[in-house]
Regions:
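Acetyl-CoA-dependent GNAT
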Residues: 3-82, 93-95, 99, 156-162
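Conserved phosphate-binding and hydrolysis motifs of nucleotide-dependent enzymes
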Residues: 59, 87-89, 127
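Active-site acidic-Proline motif in GNAT/NAT acetyltransferases
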Residues: 80-86, 114-115
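Conserved acyl-CoA
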Residues: 91-107, 129
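Conserved short alpha-helix immediately C-terminal to the canonical SAM/SAH-binding motif I
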Residues: 92, 116-119
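C-terminal "cap" of GNAT-fold acetyltransferases
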Residues: 106, 113-117, 126-129, 135-162
Length: 162
């Protein structure tokens, strides 16, 4: 097997990125991301794209500053499925943490679904510690286009940023 090194950069996610991010979710999910871009314009959230040299997103995710006071809450984190377990998720989380620190905040939090042990293991490797559990739910689009309510249990995790 040959190893390939790809240079990555993190930047603000822009509306034009939606067309190349079908890998991250359904049309309903992408419509939600579009809504978050307006919140980013207002300074309520940061929404990031991790790109290779082509400037096409291979990962994306947000930091919400309105969930808890003095905390940046990471959410909607996703890495292109073909590129998972290559370090891109780590790059995304670290870029999000930098955004949090640039706002003068020192705590990052996130929720990870309990049926996603690989993601939880990543967050633990990055220094996140579980502190609670909480049910969560959202609408998702089925393959036939219909909407259904998705319900899950999440482990809440946090990290003190240096």
């Amino acid at each position: 097997m040959t190893n390939v090194v790809v240079k990555l950069s993190a930047r603000d996610f822009v509306h034009a990125d939606l067309a190349s991010c079908g890998w991250s979710g359904s049309e309903l999910h992408l419509a939600s991301v579009a809504t978050q871009l307006e919140r980013a314009r207002l300074g309520e959230v940061d929404y990031l794209a991790v790109c290779s040299a082509t400037d096409i997103p291979v990962a994306k995710g947000g930091v919400d500053y309105r969930v808890k006071e003095r905390v940046g809450t990471l959410w909607q984190l996703a890495v292109h499925p073909a590129l998972q377990s290559c370090g891109i998720g780590t790059f995304l989380v670290e870029a999000a943490e930098l955004r949090i620190m640039n706002r003068g905040l020192r705590r990052a939090e996130l929720g990870v679904e309990e049926n996603n042990p690989r993601a939880r293991a990543l967050y633990e490797r990055l220094g996140y510690v579980a502190y609670d559990r909480q049910p969560d739910s959202w609408h998702e689009q089925a393959p036939d286009g219909s909407l259904r309510r998705y319900e899950t249990m999440c482990t809440l995790m946090r990290k003190e940023l240096l």
